[in-house]
Amino acid sequence: ISSMIPLGTQGSAMTIDNAIKIVPELKSAYKTEPDTKRIIDLAKKMEGCVRHISVHAAGVVMAPRPLWEFTPVQYDPKGGHIITQYDMYSIEDAGLPKFDFLGIRNLAILAEAVRLVKKIHKIDIDVDKLPLNDKKTFEMLARGETMGLFQLNGSGMTRYLKELQPSSIHDINAMVALYRPGPMEMIPEYIKRKKNPNLITYIDPRLKDILKMSYGIITYQDDVLFTAIGLAGYSWLEADKLRKAMGKKIPEVMQAEKEKLLAGFIKNGLTEKKANELWSLIEPFAAYGFGKAHAASYGLVAYQTAYLKANYPVEYMTAIMTSESGDIEKVAEIINECQK
């Protein structure tokens, strides 16, 4: 029975009732097979219930008064810490902010590499003051030597970097933002436009100021917000509501925003055809769009790892090997990379 139920679309789970509507075989089995009907009816009663307790690894909820005045709480079964019983959406409805404090292993790798450079070469490196136009760094990225780099490793990203031939930190930021489901489909066009500026076009001239740094491609959530403000007449408050709708990936909320955005585009001078064309560029960001500050933060750390690997490869690869010392297969891969 489960094999007949399709997956949901991006950001939206498939329901049993919807599956019965759209899958003729499932609909027929439900109507004609008593056992199938009994199993599906039982499944419907459990649908939507929490299957297990999961805790966000980095989520911290803050409150002005004791937490239990806002949300039911319990002890985390694994660690003994107090956790909320509300999920992230209910927590927001209760008026509480949730902050994600993420740890990045690559920061420890950077620190170890910097320590080794100082010990061996007597050079003090401040990773926050590296030149952002280092030729060796961009040449290494263009060759696809990305193993051990933050956010830039992996076969898919490496292939795109070799095609892109990045030449600025902006290219790295853009790749960090685009390399995820949805926006990823724009990467080939981004590469084409970087290589041939004659291909850069804008649906409306007003988009030039917003998108000129990304060759006319919508790349960040910020691009969507500025487009809504500049071309649909949104206020900053309305744009922030659009951002929240995109971040939460709630289909019905996005549908309402789509209708409002299209109406705003048309009211502010776009034809219906161009308004829909612009929406088709915005829509992929509804599920996985990156904020520019987020992409720039990740992009900077990615560049820092690339700079150290390009300029101090022995020290950087030693730091990576130390970090992965508990994984023999990883260590073997690192040794193979070093031998190249």
How does the language model describe each region?
Residues I1-K340:
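Alpha-helical scaffold/interaction cores of sigma-54-like transcription cofactors
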